[in-house]
Amino acid sequence: MAPLTRYRADNDHVPLPFVEEYYEQRGSVPGTLLVTEATFISPQAGGYANVPGIHNAAQIKAWKEVTDAVHGKGSFIYCQLWALGRAAKPEVINAEGFDHVSSSAVPINMDSPVPRALTEREIQQYIKDYAHAAKSAIEAGFDGVEIHGANGYLIDQFIQDISNHRTDSWGGSTENRARFAIEVTKAVIAAVGADKTAIRLSPWNTFQGMKMADPKPQFSYLVSVLKELKLAYLHLIGSRFDEEKINFLTDIWGKTSPILVAGSLARDASGLMLRASHPNNAGSVVQKYPNSDVVAVFGRYFIANPDLPFRIEKGLALREYDRTTFYTPMSTVGYTDLPFSEEFQNTIHVGA
């Protein structure tokens, strides 16, 4: 399951009690890998209300209940580590006592507030915060952590020249723009081990004012360096446009470790999701990326179908998702009230 922001934490960024049930439901098919919603690494990394954190004792305790529940179903769960940067809502981050910051003083668009460029000291503190959050995640029982380096958030703001206008050692060249992502990854590895560390990237993303004119050299360099760090996996977000492929990155990574691919997975004419991991299926990730160990990642359909892996395997119809419930703060509606398929429930009864 892909990371999915849902705003189901309390006002102190602690996951609410029913978050445990949500993840337990989606880990009900043994062997499923869940990646949590993006989770703040520190108070200053935030800027949205009702998003969970993983940096204090109360948050660790709440997440421990989640990880225990998922492991009880025979599944696995990684915590996605998040810092917003300029994507933060200024009124929220300011109210919490922190500045609105980014790699550079470059706004998302002409109508957005201008963030303050991070200082050298602040950059070093962020790197430490990622490492601390990673340790906290392992303490909370997570199987590993996924560094959120995609979708126009802080790490992505350093990676891409459209948002990074620095002329010091953190910008100005392909190597320097990649440095923050690399240093964060190395710090997390030092904290919890490479086998528990992953990263998510989105070279073709246009969300939040992103996308370089030509992302290939920048992301090729970054992935070539990350490859040498022997991460647990690489998570890539694909594009809906045929000319914007991610094969240039999967080919670099090869079979170093698994690659998770999210976005634009094919559906057949009847509306059933293709069995995207099956090698004999047209449009499968195996056929698209023959030189890598690639796994399909699903997001929104996992919200509406808590037994999604079972439905895909059995070729069952998928329940359509309801966008209006995606971001309803602190509500169980559209969160823990989605039913399992009758067929899956029958297997549970038989097993019992």
Q: What are these language model-derived features?
A:
Residues 2-352:
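Flavin-dependent oxidoreductase catalytic cores
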